[in-house]
Regions:
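Short, hydrophobic/glycine-enriched beta-strand segments
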Residues: 2-8
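Active-site-adjacent betaalpha module
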Residues: 3, 32-35, 57-177
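Short acidic, Gly/Ser-rich segments with clustered Asp/Glu that frequently serve as metal-coordination loops
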Residues: 12-16
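A short alpha/beta connector and helix-capping loop motif
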Residues: 18-46
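Phosphate-coordination/substrate-recognition cap region in phosphate-metabolizing enzymes
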Residues: 54
């Protein structure tokens, strides 16, 4: 069975000082995917970073909240994490096992941190992974602008030699066909 992961799409990641590439487009595509997954009775899983007072994402604080533009339904699952890897010391793998999930479709923020780490972790745990090419975002970095970072990671993932399980990088429109 399949599941959609939506990683760290939280208010604290989308402040004016942390501008993300194509935020509204990314949100729209994630919402379209979420609706399609729900229609097909596949789980939609929000991964939410729990931070500390020293950084942002303190549970209960405004920065920690999922973006209100994302459509969330009562049956959606939310899993908290404290590290870049959504599997590290979380209930994600247990939840996926309970629901017989073998294929993950991954979206979210930030491409070069939590999204990348979670993709690689999922592969090492023998999940089939589909990265949504236009369903993840990041900010510009000191040596690369955000579109270059996103393009680089899409290229990297598409060219990886994963475990015996598959890794694909696919545009939203190709999933929604």
């Amino acid at each position: 069975m399949k599941a959609l992961l939506i990683i760290d799409m939280q208010k604290g990641s989308f402040k004016p000082y942390t501008l993300r590439h194509d935020t509204l487009g990314t949100i729209d595509r994630i919402n379209s995917l979420s609706a399609a997954f729900r229609t097909n009775h596949y789980p939609v899983i929000f991964i939410q970073h729990d931070g500390t007072r020293e950084n942002c994402f303190l549970p209960g604080a405004e920065d920690w909240e999922i973006l209100p533009e994302l459509e969330r339904l009562p049956n959606d699952i939310t899993i908290s994490k404290t590290a870049n890897d959504a599997f590290y010391k979380t209930s994600l793998q247990e939840t996926l096992s309970e629901k017989s999930i073998t294929e993950l479709f991954i979206t979210g923020c930030a491409t070069d941190f939590c999204v990348d780490t979670t993709i690689k972790s999922a592969l090492s745990k023998d999940y089939n992974v589909t990265v949504i090419e236009d369903g993840h975002t990041t900010a510009s970095r000191p040596f690369l602008d955000a579109p270059a970072v996103i393009n680089h990671y899409n290229w990297l993932w598409a060219d990886m030699s994963p475990t015996k399980y598959k890794l694909a990088v696919v545009k939203t429109c190709d999933i929604l066909l």
